Amino acid sequence: MFDSMSLHMRRPALAARALCLLLVAALSTSVPATASSSSAAVPGTTCTVFPSDNVWNTDISKLPVNRLSDAWMRSMHSGSTDLHPDFGPPSYGMPFTVTDASTAKHRVKFQYASESDKGPYPFGPKTPIEGGQNAGGDRHAMMVDRSTCTLYELYHAYWNGGNPKAGSGAVYDLTANHLRPNGWTSADAAGLPIFPGLIRYDEVRAGFIGHAIRFTADNTRDQHIWPARHDASDLTASRYPPMGARFRLKAGFSLSGFSRDARVILTAMKHYGLILADNGSDWYFQGTRDSRWKNSLLDQLKRVPASAFQAVDESACMVSANSAQASCPS
């Protein structure tokens, strides 16, 4: 360690240099390194996840607080609940796979065919399934075709001995700001894509997450707001949050004491926030399945109280009701 006083007495130039080094070191312990100002490409591809002006990729840190924020927060038990990272090493988290033009595509039989994209889908007997091949539950499957930058998502997916079936399915052009038809589900209850809202290990290690994060609530309203396209509830009271509601970690929440990787995630929650996308446990947020996730990181994130969040009003960011393009007022 430098003794800055003695250096100042003996060598003024070295003292100045030492001070700079100390300042840099101090900053590096409090602010996550930002490797980029835009979201990273999907590993194994050159595909970014939607254009930079997509609502998922929009900074909402300056937006006004939603007038229903307090009511929504109470309905989500924010006074007695902490964040819960719903991902980790196998079998936790959402798996995805990268495909290309040579990957065989198949037609899938859908339970909700009228609200599903016909495909075909690059889905096969070895495609990773949420929870594992023998799992129950939602059984999401996600595939990114690197040759066309197309995202394919399935809900309740089964290979079924070569006759694949699923509850629903959706296909997304990752280079465009398209939304699904209003009223359509997807592989998620909100009618939104899942993959853009997942925390990925590669993003955290690169030092920057430039998108909103998917999360769930136990009780949601029978309503959806932009950019969501679908809802799944029979609760009518306005105290319940609708699908598509966006929340952010309050700017004043201190990141002191959190590890570098935890600060990367929490900084994203301050700037890009969380989007309510499905019914589930209150304040569970999602990431990819990855053996490199450390329990020490996940445990830190569980220390964040839900009361440190607030809902925002992003209605002014909407360019068109039928587009995911966003332009928020500065």
Where are these regions (language model features)?
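Short, surface-exposed polybasic-aromatic patches that bind anionic ligands, especially phosphate groups
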Residues: 39-330
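Secretory targeting and sorting signals
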Residues: 2-37
